[in-house]
Amino acid sequence: MVLSGALCFRMKDSALKVLYLHNNQLLAGGLHAGKVIKGEEISVVPNRWLDASLSPVILGVQGGSQCLSCGVGQEPTLTLEPVNIMELYLGAKESKSFTFYRRDMGLTSSFESAAYPGWFLCTVPEADQPVRLTQLPENGGWNAPITDFYFQQCD
C-alpha cells in the first residue's frame, strides 16, 4: 500500500514537554510568552527502502515541507532541511540521513538515527531548548538527555 499523504502525529518527551517550531528550530517546552503551546504537527511516513521490521520513519514539520535530518558529517547534527517528506517517501533512495528507527517501549517511543546507529533524538531537562541527538549515557542522572517520547496521532 502506498500512502497518498503523510500521517500526522504530535510528540511530547517523557517529561511532557511538547515539540514546537520557533525561528525554524524544533524546540521542546510547554509555555511560550505565558501561553500554553499546543505542539507542532509532525508529519510521518515510513521509509520503504529500509527493513520494515525496524520501523523506519521519516519525520517532517510544516506540513512535511521540512524534514529532520542527521546530516552527513563525522558526527550527526540534527537539522531541519527544506525537503518534501512525500518526495523522500516516494523516491528511490534510502534517505538514511532523514530516517529514524522507532522503538516502542510501552507508552513511549525512542527514535534512533538510521545513518548514525546509537544516536537518538532527545530533549534536555530545561524547557525551550532545541531537540538534538545524543548517544545513550551509561547512567542517567537528573540532567541526562530525555530520549523517550509520547507519539500520538493527531485528532
UniProtKB/Swiss-Prot annotation:
Pfam families: IL1. Keywords: Cytokine, Cytoplasm, Disease variant, Disulfide bond, Immunity, Innate immunity, Secreted. GO terms for molecular function: cytokine activity; interleukin-1 receptor antagonist activity; interleukin-1 receptor binding. Predominantly expressed in skin keratinocytes but not in fibroblasts, endothelial cells or melanocytes. Detected also in the spleen, brain leukocyte and macrophage cell types. Increased in lesional psoriasis skin. Its main location: cytoplasm. Gene3D superfamilies: 2.80.10.50. Induction: By phorbol ester (PMA) and bacterial lipopolysaccharides (LPS) treatment in macrophage cell line. By Aspergillus fumigatus conidia in peripheral blood mnonocytes. One of its GO terms (biological process) is negative regulation of type II interferon production. It is found in: Cytoplasm; Secreted. GO terms for cellular component: cytoplasm; extracellular region; extracellular space. Disulfide bonds join C8-C154. Belongs to the IL-1 family. It is linked to Psoriasis 14, pustular: A life-threatening disease defined by repeated flares of sudden onset consisting of diffuse erythematous skin eruption characterized by rapid coverage with pustules, high-grade fever, asthenia, marked leukocytosis, and elevated serum levels of C-reactive protein. Inhibits the activity of interleukin-36 (IL36A,IL36B and IL36G) by binding to receptor IL1RL2 and preventing its association with the coreceptor IL1RAP for signaling. Part of the IL-36 signaling system that is thought to be present in epithelial barriers and to take part in local inflammatory response; similar to the IL-1 system with which it shares the coreceptor. Proposed to play a role in skin inflammation. May be involved in the innate immune response to fungal pathogens, such as Aspergillus fumigatus. May activate an anti-inflammatory signaling pathway by recruiting SIGIRR. Interacts with cargo receptor TMED10; the interaction mediates the translocation from the cytoplasm into the ERGIC (endoplasmic reticulum-Golgi intermediate compartment) and thereby secretion. This is Interleukin-36 receptor antagonist protein.
